């Protein structure tokens, strides 16, 4: 079933309440006359069914709530975490890594593991697939890149289903799994123009020839299951098991409610990985020796794409407690910046590039 037919199928017609006169002459509402299990019972049953059916796909990984070593990072030396932040941050990352390469730091080769979320999933996938190197070699970096990234930004005025998803996402006060499910429901019901094949084409702009494969074992993308609220982590092994190409993993991680997606990974519809209280998913690198963590904000100040609290500093303290040494780079955002506005891209490229010149020597020392 295609995504459009699936959503048409979900549209239901309103059914009026029929009054049925029983033998006693009492008028009974037909809706109440039907024997339906109470909500808690059906919810419990639904959870049991879902857990049983999806237990073997290997995609769901609980978010750590206390310091603990990640099975993915155990025994590794250098790891890198790339957080999210819309089109602005994708452009910032590109300028940043362009500058690091000029300074002698090839971030496509140094880390043994990269965790990317939303914008970070795009740039991480671009780096490790080799596409970023090709793009910066073939094109005038500051001339051509803004044109490429403008294709990623939403081009149409949002409709009411998109506005609903956005407003629900921007009304969240916690990152509980129940809150994630509510946002996920709204994301699923949003009629996003940036969807399906178009999302894949956008993803392939940065990930290159990765629409049929997951070419690197070092790249992990994150997302949130719209139905269950679970954290989804995709690496090469689970990607090949579920038939997930790298371009789709990056697209799902960047499927912001009311803007793009959700994106189908295996048999799960997945939304932006930042829709939780560990927005960069730093717990996945806990136990590695040294982690370079790059986030758009400190979780307290700066532009946001959800109102779910983002205690990034505490997330990082937890992985330090698990034995990981951390260098944390906070990109920061200009006052009043729109993270989804393509007009911001040229400036973001230059800002990231300039920041690389400030950080290069520190990163060299950290990973020496």
Regions found by a protein language model. Give the residues of each.
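N-terminal export signals
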Residues: 2, 8-30
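Short, cationic motifs built from Arg/Lys/His that form the positively charged side of catalytic pockets
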Residues: 6-7, 88
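Patatin-like phospholipase
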Residues: 12-16, 38-114, 125-368
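Boundary at the C-terminal end of the N-terminal hydrophobic targeting segment
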Residues: 31-35
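Gly/Ala-rich beta-loop-alpha elbow adjacent to hydrolase catalytic centers
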Residues: 116, 120
């Amino acid at each position: 079933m295609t995504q459009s037919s699936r959503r048409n199928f979900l549209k239901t017609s309103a059914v009026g309440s029929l009054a049925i006169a029983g033998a006693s002459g009492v008028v009974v509402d037909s809706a109440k006359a039907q024997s339906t299990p109470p909500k808690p019972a059906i919810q419990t049953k639904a959870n049991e069914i879902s857990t049983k059916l999806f237990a073997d796909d290997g995609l769901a990984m609980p978010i750590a709530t206390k310091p603990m070593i990640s099975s993915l990072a155990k025994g590794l030396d250098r790891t890198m975490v790339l957080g999210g932040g819309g089109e602005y941050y994708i452009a910032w990352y590109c300028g940043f890594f362009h500058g690091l390469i000029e300074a002698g730091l090839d971030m496509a080769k140094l880390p043994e593991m990269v965790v990317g979320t939303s914008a970070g999933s795009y740039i991480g996938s671009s780096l490790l697939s080799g596409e970023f190197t090709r793009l910066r070699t073939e094109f005038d970096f500051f001339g051509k890149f803004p044109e490429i990234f403008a294709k990623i930004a939403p081009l149409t005025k949002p409709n009411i289903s998109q506005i609903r998803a956005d407003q629900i996402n921007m009304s969240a006060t916690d990152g509980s799994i129940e809150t994630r499910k509510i946002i996920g429901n709204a994301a699923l019901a949003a009629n996003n123009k940036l969807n399906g094949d178009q999302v894949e084409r956008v993803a392939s702009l940065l990930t290159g020839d990765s629409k049929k494969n997951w070419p690197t074992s070092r790249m992990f993308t994150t997302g949130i299951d719209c139905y269950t609220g679970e954290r989804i982590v995709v690496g090469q092994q689970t990607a090949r098991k579920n038939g997930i190409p790298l371009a789709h993993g990056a697209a799902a991680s960047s499927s912001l409610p009311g803007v793009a997606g959700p994106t189908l990974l295996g048999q799960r519809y997945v939304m932006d990985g930042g829709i939780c209280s560990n927005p960069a998913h730093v717990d996945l690198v806990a136990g590695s020796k040294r982690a370079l963590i790059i986030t758009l904000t400190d979780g307290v100040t700066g532009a946001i794409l959800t109102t779910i609290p983002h205690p990034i500093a505490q997330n990082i303290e937890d992985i330090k407690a698990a034995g990981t040494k951390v260098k944390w780079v906070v990109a920061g955002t200009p006052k009043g910046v729109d993270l989804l506005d393509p007009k911001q891209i040229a400036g973001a490229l230059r800002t990231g590039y300039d920041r690389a010149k400030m950080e290069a020597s520190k990163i060299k020392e950290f990973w020496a």
